[in-house]
Structure formats: C-alpha cells, structure tokens
Amino acid sequence: MAAPRTSTRKFLGRLSLPERNFVAEALRTETVGGVLLLLAAITALIWANVPALHHSYESVSHFHFGPAPLGLDLSVQHWAADGLLAVFFFVAGIELKRELVAGDLKDPKAAALPVAAALCGMAVPALVYTLTNLTGGGSLRGWAVPTATDIAFALAVLAVIGTSLPSALRAFLLTLAVVDDLFAILIIAVFFTADLNFAALAGAVIGLAVFWLLLRKGVRGWYVYVPLALVIWGLMYNSGIHATIAGVAMGLMLRCHRHQGEEHAPGEHIEHLVRPLSAGLAVPLFALFSAGVVISGGALGDVFTRPETLGVVLGLVVGKAIGIFGGTWLTARFTRASLSDDLAWPDVFAVASLAGIGFTVSLLIGELAFDGDPVLTDEVKAAVLTGSLLAALIATTLLKLRNAKYRALCEDEERDEDSDGIPDIYEQDNPAYHLRMAEIYERKAAEHRRLAEVTGGAGAENDGPA
C-alpha cells in the first residue's frame, strides 16, 4: 500500500493581484513618508548638535501650549509623541483590522508564520537586552525598546540604496510590522500606564462606544468623527493610559471588509486619506522632536559600554535578525511549509536584519521607559539611532548581494506585454490573455516578414554586376 502523500504549503510565494496592488499602494506612501522621516531625523541631529542652533532646538521642543484647565498644557515634544503619534497608531489599527479580516492574518495557517516570526522578533531582542543588563548590572526598564520595527524607515533605506524587493518579501515585512505594532501597543498599554483616572477612562470608553455606534449606524461626515476623536483622545490622555491607545481603538472599529457593490470598505477609504497625513507629517514631526540627541565622541562610546544602551543596540542588530529568522525557520519546519522556489533563506535573513530598524516606536518606548531620567533617555535614543543604522548597513549589504535576482523577479511581476493593466504573470490561466498575445506576436511576425522581404529585395537588386 502506498504511503499517503504529505502536501507542503509554500510561503513567501506570489501574492494575489488585489493583495499585490494593496501592498504596492500602501508601501508607496510609506516609502515617501520614510524618506521624510529620514530627513527629519537628520535635521533633528543637526539642529541639536550645532552649537549655534542647540538652544533654539531645546526652546522649541520644550515650549508649552494647550488648554491647561483640560490637563493638556503640553510641550511641543509631548504633543508630537502623544498627539501626532495617535494618528500613526490610528492607521496601524486600520492596518491590523484589515489584515485580520482580509489579509494574511485572516487564515490561521497563513497567519502562523508572520505572527510567530514577529513574536520571536520581539521576544529575542527583549531577552538580549535583559541578559545584557543582568550581566552588566543595568536597568531592566528598557527591555521593550528594541522590540519594535519601523516599516517606513526600512522602506526609506530600500529607496535610498535602490533595492527592489519582490512583493512577497515586501508583504512579509509589512505584516511583520503590523503584528509588531499590535504587540507594541499592548506593551505600552500594559507596562507604561500611569496611575489611572477612572473618571477620564470611563469618559473615553463612553466616547469610543459612541464612535462605534455612529459607525454601525452608517453616519458619515468628518465634522462628526474628528471632534469626537479629539474628545476621546483628550480623555484617554488624562486617564493615565497612553493617548495613542485611543487612535488604535478607533482604527480597529472601522469596517475593513467590503459589502456587495462596494469598491472600497470604509476602513480602506479612510486609511487612504489618513495614511499620507501619518507618514508625511505626524511621524516626521515626531522624529524631528525626538531624535535630536546631542552626539559626541564620548556619548557614542557610552552606547557600547553602558549596559542599557548596549542592550538596545544588540537587541536591534542581533536579536531582531535572529528572532525573526529563527521564528520563520522553526514555523516553516513544524508546519511543513516550504520556501517559494524564487527565494532562498538568505533572503529571509536579509529582511529580518532590515526589521532591526526600530526607530519611531522604539524612541517612544525609550521615552516612556526612562521618563524622569533625561540623561539616560537621550543615551537610549542615541542607542536606537546607532542600532537602527547598523541594522540598515547590514541589511543593505545582504540585499545588495541578491539585488540582480530581486530585479529580475520584480520585472517578471510588472511585465504587461498586452498592455491591459494586469501583469502577465497573473493571466497565465486566462485564455483571452493568450489570444491577445497571439495577435500581438502575429502582428510582429507579419512586420518582420515585410521587413525581410524589403531587405531581401534591396539585397537582390544590389547583387547584380557593377
């Protein structure tokens, strides 16, 4: 009796056309935002480190404004971290909801791999940080700093070095970042919540309930939701829970599955409107007022000698790469999934290294973890910048080694010889596509025959005696 066949499931294979189009559109905006984020970080470092400009940077960052009776007389730096990042986490909430109802996280089998990779990619950096500080006698408060991935910064690196990742690897990186954001949100909510103001928290919950009810009733109009969102955010801030949680909660409430006849779900439409605001304004401004740490030779030396900062660097550079790669490899092994024929395991390790760029959320968690110790906060920020830079350099080297292969795969994914707007690789099972291609090649063949006859005739006339 023949042994039963064991089927192997492919992962990191070709995306469906709708998923490919969604990933391409989402990452296009994130790439532009990532370049702006990179420029904002560089501007912050220059502004904070040029002696003639340093005082103005400190003055602007610590300038307070806002309604004091409402508990919102905040510095510019706090408005950026607590206010603008709420927009970023609102988009993250929509992304997570979409992944859960229509993306890779909808199917438990398909979700197992990116979720396991993301979990390992957070657990191992936290473990690396903890072991480094237990050995060196440092503070364990920053264990969560190296656990985050900054998708926008990673895409900016790809844009700068001119590397074209295949859509499957880009989708894998995007899903990793979405799951990362989810657990970062949970970490912020659970471990960095101050003394609770239950009255404000109750008000925020009631506001969220009203927000949900209006969505379910189909009420439309930004003039309804924007003021309500601001009220919810203000109440959440005063409750003691980090205000960005309000953005996530509202994002998760949006409907991201399409009803019959709908071209876009409401969540997709709102994400399309808000993502440019998040990527192009909110996150770069946060970087501008958070990345401005004073860098000196001594400070850079301390990054590699102080246990807290060394733990952050090792967590981002070593922990992220080993965690994501190890989680992916182990999950594939135990679920009997096989890697796509077009890719190799070094490609997964390169993407895992790229995920070690943990800029935005790592800076935020660093501020929360070491609140009250401005010197250590700045040192940890410098460690985040250093670790992200090292991770980017390692990923750049690894990706460049495979760039020719990636370029060929991207060209295959984008080729559209029949000019119908759909890449040819997605039409191989469509008879109409092959008929169109046959007509195209027949026209080309007829043209070549005509040219051959003309050339042959001219040659025959010139073959006669001089």
Curated annotation (Swiss-Prot):
**Highest taxon listed in the record's lineage:** Bacteria
Q: So what does this thing catalyse?
A: Na(+)(in) + 2 H(+)(out) = Na(+)(out) + 2 H(+)(in)
Q: Does the keyword Zinc apply?
A: no
GO molecular function terms listed in the Swiss-Prot or TrEMBL record: sodium:proton antiporter activity
- What cellular-component terms does GO give this entry? plasma membrane
Transmembrane stretches, start-end: 32-52, 74-94, 111-131, 142-162, 172-192, 195-215, 221-241, 280-300, 310-330, 348-368, 379-399
Which InterPro entries does the UniProt entry name for this protein?
Na/H_antiporter_dom_sf, NhaA
Membrane topology label:
Multi-pass membrane protein
**Which BP terms from GO are recorded?**
regulation of pH
Where is this chain's protein located in or outside the cell? Cell membrane
**Cross-referenced Pfam families:** Na_H_antiport_1
- What keywords are assigned to this protein? Antiport, Cell membrane, Ion transport, Membrane, Sodium, Sodium transport, Transmembrane, Transmembrane helix, Transport
Q: Does the keyword Transmembrane apply?
A: yes
HAMAP family documented for this protein: NhaA
Q: What family is this? A: Belongs to the NhaA Na(+)/H(+) (TC 2.A.33) antiporter family.
Give the protein's function. Na(+)/H(+) antiporter that extrudes sodium in exchange for external protons.
Q: Which NCBIfam families match?
A: NhaA (TIGR00773)
Q: What is this protein called?
A: Na(+)/H(+) antiporter NhaA
Print the organism lineage.
Bacteria, Bacillati, Actinomycetota, Actinomycetes, Kitasatosporales
